[in-house]
Amino acid sequence: MGPETDAFLTEVLREQQAAEVAFRNGDAEPRLALWSCQEPMSWLGQYGACATGAADVREHFRRVATRFSDPREFLFELIEADAHGDAAYSVGFEHFLGSFDGHPDTVMTHRVSRVYRREDGRWRIAHGHGDVAPWARRSSSRA
């Protein structure tokens, strides 16, 4: 990766890790702080979950965060990223162990992609996608 991408990852990954752990503990606000408030923005999730526009995305994440609790493990595994000018993306897997919908010891691996844009000197997520990783889908009775 080049210096522009390295600088992007240095700025984004630590803050993103903390925000995702908070999300898995039922608090969507740190995650939302990383997202843009400017249109267009969207989220596309598994099973047809789609949110378009800032208000819809925020409502969706606040609702989903309430389904998580007790994050005993969370790891973001970066697969690929790139940054040029005011645009960037990241692709990876989010590995989670904790409670989901009241089920303790839930293990999840989600494949996630995020598209970022620089706004007022900070990277903000403009679009995201997440679904159950293909190998986890085959081995899970809940997927």
Regions inferred by a protein language model and the residue ranges of each:
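A beta-strand edge to alpha-helix "cap/lid" segment located at domain peripheries
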Residues: 1-36, 41-143
